[in-house]
Amino acid sequence: MPAIQNPKSVPDLIKLIARHGKKLLLVSGVDPSGDRMPVGKIIIDVTGVLLLNEIDIKKDRITIGTGINLGRLAREATGENGLLQQAASIIANPLVRNRITFVEALNPDSPYFDITTPLVLLDAKVRLQSTSGKRTLSIRDFLEAVTKGLKKGELPIAVEFSRLPSDARVGFFRVARMGGKGTVSAAARMKLVRTVCVNPEIVVSSLTLVPLRVKGAEKEIAGKPANEFSIKKAGEIAAEEILQLAETDNAYERTLIEITVARTLRSIMEGSIPM
């Protein structure tokens, strides 16, 4: 059975991370002694670190501790009109959802890294802490930093974002590439006023380091009634935008982006599309 550590505070947890680095696996909300854990890993049960397990609501600001697992995120996330709940449910099936912590999903090597796509749409910020201090980064700056490598012992301890307006409609979808070589995901938000799309925002994660807004696709549906033609056209424009930025023209990737964006938009608009 792997060694299990039970820190009770963020400083204690940070010290363990600085000492053991990539040998660690953080878990929360499960019994690490009774569940199957990877061999060769030092298991850190962060259940006792209260700061990492809080979902805090202060006026219009939501803060979610990164120690919660994706199962809890799928059940209890708030202020995002169901966006993070959708994403957590889609990217992690029920068999593993309670084993994967939010902080593990924020690792670029994680198969659950698509949780960052809705975070970009929410314009979230990430709080980090290390043995040398604290800092807060925008989600885009965090994604660039974490891909290059965070400071030794540094840990994302919380994600915060502004509450969405109650009339904002949201959607998320993800598809996996054949052969297990990564994923494509999209997140979108908009208002629907008498079936007309108002102030749409669409974020796509595919071939680029940081999920990107596809403004041409947004323009295609803005101010127009929800319909299948606009959805299909927006998917095509989004694919073209992403492929141009990635400086490639891959027919398979183009199809995946088109499908992902269309499914995301359709999930928002389906009740408003004429039959």
Predicted regions and their residues:
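C-terminal structural segment of proteins
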Residues: 1-275
